[in-house]
């Protein structure tokens, strides 16, 4: 999985920039911006790696001797490290604007390797800085820029903005039998739109979203003139893939979930977002169809979903009414999924360090 990065300016963003000469060249000029350390710790826990990138005009010249820079800078780095803030890299351009070098922000020379390796999660990486050149650097890198300001966008605000979840995924799956478009928003509720061409199946999918506490949009065009097999199976595959993508790095999720009574039915659902696909399914139906949905395809749907989502899923229901039995399975799965995808912290719920 690609890595989230924060490319952070130094003077005026991490530490205060002296208005007199814009140089932190003495220990008494070193002052940290408010809340910078606790917020950076929070962002590290959320999965971001930190890269410092700074223009230091004339560094190493008579007007800004290297030794004058090194003392305060090294102390700053020692303080960051002592508090658990770790920068993967510190990138410095020492040139003056008149030098017309190729490494001065907003040029991308210093960050070329992050762009070339394609290991950066561009959609979730940011440049943070107090100047227009920082925002221009972000534009040149194809990522988002955040203009730091103590009043309008301070470190507390940045921390809240970057750790607020809005987990989303979009999957398109086209085969000779089906054309499927699935969008999932795990942190939004309501207004789900589902059209598979199988009315009862639409109703069941809506139960997953409603009881799962999330929103999804599913559009399917399938070979229903034959039967509902490909439509149901491929929808399960596409939805499972979308849920897996929306979960992202899975940090902070509860991972596990559980049981649901419905009228005369008792449905049991146990779920582990483990990365290991497996289904145990036990349900018997009196009739071959409920509405326009084949009852034999219900197990096939959950098997397809568990395979692409990478989950261990146990489903079981008992009852007297086929409609209720089917609905209890989808409701129980939705309710269990609601528990499992809920974010309660920022650590990965696995002793292995991977899910």
UniProtKB/Swiss-Prot annotation:
Any one GO cellular component localisation term in the record: cytoplasm
Give the region (Histidinol-phosphatase) as residue ranges: 1-166
Keyword GTP-binding listed = no
Which pathway or pathways does this protein act in? Amino-acid biosynthesis; L-histidine biosynthesis; L-histidine from 5-phospho-alpha-D-ribose 1-diphosphate: step 6/9; Amino-acid biosynthesis; L-histidine biosynthesis; L-histidine from 5-phospho-alpha-D-ribose 1-diphosphate: step 8/9
Entry GO MF terms: histidinol-phosphatase activity; imidazoleglycerol-phosphate dehydratase activity; metal ion binding
Q: Note the CDD domains from the entry.
A: HAD_HisB-N, IGPD
Which family does the entry's similarity section mention? In the N-terminal section; belongs to the histidinol-phosphatase family. In the C-terminal section; belongs to the imidazoleglycerol-phosphate dehydratase family.
Q: What is this protein called?
A: Histidine biosynthesis bifunctional protein HisB
